[in-house]
Amino acid sequence: MVRRRDATPSYKDIKRTIQCKSATAGCNQQDAIRSYDDSEDTEWKNDGRMSTAWIRYELAEKARVDEVVLKLTGWRKREYPLQIFTDDTLVWEGKTPVSLGYVHLPLAASQPAGSITIKLQGSASDSDKYGNIKELAAPVANELDLFKAKDGDKVRSELRIVECDLLQWIKPN
């Protein structure tokens, strides 16, 4: 018996990506695009001072953003105390959890906005949640996870974003 498969996928999208048209940062402006370029081999970072530990994404369209998805340098062991704003309204505040990659930060109910701002609110701290777990991979696989970042384990007022994705629920939950 041969089963015929439909031409449509077997799933339905429940979220859509809100595109960024540009970004403004507290410093290293030329690298800001690296935080939303869909490459896990690049990053944006500030210069280690609290006054420059922020980045603002201008959206390609005015839209409601329901979730910010971040991959932060040091994801396996570093917690970043952040605030997230839609335009000038605070919609998320807390410490990012350590993870094995991306963290999903659901935002408080928000209205359509033209920008999203992410600000570091204090010193990042280390966690030993994953202890001595080792990954078998080529040495470069861990470079953005603080293993090869020069003095990356010593800087606490540094905000380092590998990837930022802004999502909207197609049907709000």
Task: Give the residues covered by each predicted segment.
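Short beta-strand-plus-loop segments that form exposed binding edges in beta-rich domains
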Residues: 119-128
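Disordered, acidic Ser/Thr/Pro-rich linker "stalks" and the adjacent N-terminal cap
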Residues: 1-62, 71-78, 86, 126, ...
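Short, conserved beta-strand segments of beta-strand-rich sandwich/propeller modules, principally
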Residues: 67, 115-117
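A short, structured loop/turn motif at beta-sheet edges
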Residues: 62, 110-112
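Short proline/glycine- and polar residue-rich coil/turn motifs
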Residues: 95-100
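Surface-exposed loop/edge segments in extracytoplasmic proteins
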Residues: 88-94
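Exposed aromatic-hydrophobic patches
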Residues: 57, 101-109
